[in-house]
Amino acid sequence: MNQSAQNYFSVQKPSETSSGPYTSPPPIGYPTRDAVVGDPPAAAVETNSKGVNPEAIMSCFSTCMECIFCCGVCSSLCTSE
């Protein structure tokens, strides 16, 4: 027997009706490739910016400064002997 005869093997074409091994469906809500399945796409919501509110900026700034000042005073009181 020659070398090429020993390495020859038969390849069987898979059946057209067989869909392969069973795989469980993805979890509910998991995105799939099927565009028809699932919820329709959400409509875009248009938002309107009201601009910059100077009062809100000053309130935030003053609150941050109070926090920094308080932490600075508290830390100096705690570290002094």
Curated annotation (Swiss-Prot):
Disruption phenotype: Late flowering and defective in UV-C light acceleration of flowering. Strong reduction of FLOWERING LOCUS T (FT) expression. Hypersensitivity to abscisic acid (ABA) and alterations in polar lipid contents and their corresponding fatty acids; reduced levels of phosphatidylinositol (PI) and of 18:0, but increased levels of 18:2 and 18:3 polar lipids. Increased susceptibility to the hemi-biotrophic oomycete pathogen Phytophthora brassicae but enhanced resistance to the necrotrophic fungal pathogen Botrytis cinerea. It holds the Pfam family CYSTM. It comes from the Eukaryota. GO terms for cellular component: membrane; plasma membrane. GO terms for biological process: abscisic acid-activated signaling pathway; cellular response to UV-C; circadian rhythm; defense response; lipid homeostasis; lipid metabolic process; positive regulation of defense response to oomycetes; positive regulation of phosphatidylinositol biosynthetic process. Disulfide bonds: none annotated. Its main location: membrane. Modulates resistance against pathogens including oomycetes (e.g. Hyaloperonospora parasitica and Phytophthora brassicae) and fungi (e.g. Phytophthora brassicae). Controls the abscisic acid-mediated (ABA) signaling pathways. Regulator of the flowering time in response to stress (e.g. UV-C). Regulates polar lipid content; promotes phosphatidylinositol (PI) and 18:0 but prevents 18:2 and 18:3 polar lipids accumulation. This is Cysteine-rich and transmembrane domain-containing protein PCC1. Coiled coil: none annotated. It comes from Arabidopsis thaliana. Belongs to the CYSTM1 family. It is a single-pass membrane protein. Residues 1-34 are annotated as: Disordered. Expressed at very low levels in seedlings and petioles, and at higher levels in leaves. Also present in phloem sap. Residues 1-22 have a biased composition (Polar residues). It is found in: Cell membrane. The chain crosses the membrane at residues 56-74. Induction: Rapidly up-regulated after pathogen exposure (e.g. avirulent and virulent Pseudomonas syringae pv. tomato) in a salicylic acid (SA) defense-signaling pathway-dependent manner. Circadian-regulation with accumulation during the light period, peaks of expression at the end of the day, and low levels during the dark period. Up-regulated by UV-C light through a SA-dependent process and in a CONSTANS- (CO) dependent manner. Keywords: Abscisic acid signaling pathway, Cell membrane, Lipid metabolism, Membrane, Plant defense, Transmembrane, Transmembrane helix.
